[in-house]
Amino acid sequence: MRKDYLMTPGPTPVPAEVLLTMAAPIIHHRTPDFSAAFAESIAGLKYVFDTEGDVLLFASSGTGVMEAAIANCFCVGDTVVVCRNGKFGDRQKQIAEVYGLNVVDLHYEWTSVVDPADVATALEENPGVRGVIVTQSETSSGVLNDVKAIGAIVAEYPETVLIVDSITGIGAVECKTDEWGLDVVMTGSQKGLMLPPGLAACTVSKKAWRAYARSTLPKFYFDWMRYQKNVEKDTTPFTPAVSLVLGLNVALKMIREEGLENTIARHSRLAEATRRGCEALGLKLFAPPEGRGSAVTPVWVPAGIDGKAIVKMMKSEYGVTIAGGQDDYAGRIFRVGHLGYFGDFDIITTLAALEMTLAKLGYEFERGSGIKAAESVFMEG
C-alpha cells in the first residue's frame, strides 16, 4: 500500500469535505437548493477576489475565462499591451491575435519579472490602447508580477482595462482587486480553490462593463451579460457543473474559516520552506528573488541529472507527483506546487522524496539538509 501526494500547481488536492459534497446525489440546477448554493458561492468568490464588484462563474477551464475576457472587452483592430514572461502570458498573446487585436508585445525571459515602467512606456507610446493583459502568478515559471504597480499605471487611462490572469494567484498571494484597480481578474477551480478542474471565474469592474458595451467581437457561451443577468437571479444561463458548484461552496467556506490573510500567509510559509529546502540541497531556484510567488516553486535541474527522471522516480517510487518544466524548459526544471489544500508535512514529505530521488540519481549533497531547512521555517512560525 502506498499513499500518493499530488504536489503540482494544478490540479491540486481536494479536501475530503469537498469530495463528499460532490459525491452526493446530483440535484437539479433550477431548484432553490442549487440557487442557494450558487449565491453563496458567488459571495465566497467575491471574498477571495477581494472585490465588491461583479463576479461571474463559468463551466470551463482557465483558458476559457481568458478567452472570455478578450471577447467581451475589445473590437477587431483594438490595440492591447500583452505582458508575457511565461507560457500563460504567451497564451494571452495567442488569444488576442486570434481575435484580431493589435498586440504591443512586452516579452521577457521566463526568469524575469514584468517591469511596470515598460507598461507605462507602452501606454505613452501607443495612444488609444484599450487593454493591458498580464499574468500575476505565472504557473510555468513561478514568477510573481507586480499587478498592484501596473494597476496604478493603468488607472490613469480611463478607456484602458487591466486584465489579470491570477489563475494560480487567487487564494495563494495577495490580490486586492478593487483597491489595486484591477478590472478583470481570473482564476480556475483546480488551483487555490481546492476543486477538480471544470470551473473558472472572473471579476468585472465598471470600467470593464464599459468596455463590454463597445465590444463587437463575437461571443455566445462566454457572453458576460448572459451570466450577469442570471447571477442577479442566483442562477446560470446554461447547465452548470452542478456538483462542482456545490463543492466550490464548501471550499470557499473553508477559506473563510481560515481567513484569507491566514490562507495567504500559509502559502507564503509553504513556499519559503520549499525554497529554503531546495537551496539547502545546493539546487538553484528558477524565479528571480524579486518576483517569487507562493503557488509553485520551479527549480533548475542540477548538471548531470536527468530532469525527467526526477519527476518519474518521485512518482513511481515514492508516490509524490511534481510537475516538469514546460516548452523550452522541459527537462531543465521541475516544479513543486504548494497551492491550495497543503500543509507543512506535505512539504516535508516532498523534500524527503526529492532527497532520496536525487541520491539515487547520483547527485551529491548532505542528506537531510533540505528537510532540516524546511523544518526551520515551520518552527519559526
Can you name each region flagged by the protein language model?
Residues 3-59, 63:
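A glycine-/small-polar-enriched, mobile loop at the entrance of the PLP active site in fold-type I
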Residues 13-14, 190-280, 381:
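Active-site C-terminal subdomain of aminotransferase-like
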Residues 52-81, 85, 89-93:
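Conserved beta-loop-alpha segment that forms the PLP phosphate-binding cup at the N-terminus of a helix
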Residues 114-171:
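Active-site phosphate-binding strand-loop segment of PLP-dependent enzymes
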Residues 178-190:
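Conserved active-site segment immediately N-terminal to the catalytic lysine
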Residues 284-317:
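Conserved PLP-binding catalytic core of the aspartate aminotransferase-like
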Residues 328, 332-381:
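PLP-dependent enzyme catalytic core of the Aspartate aminotransferase-like
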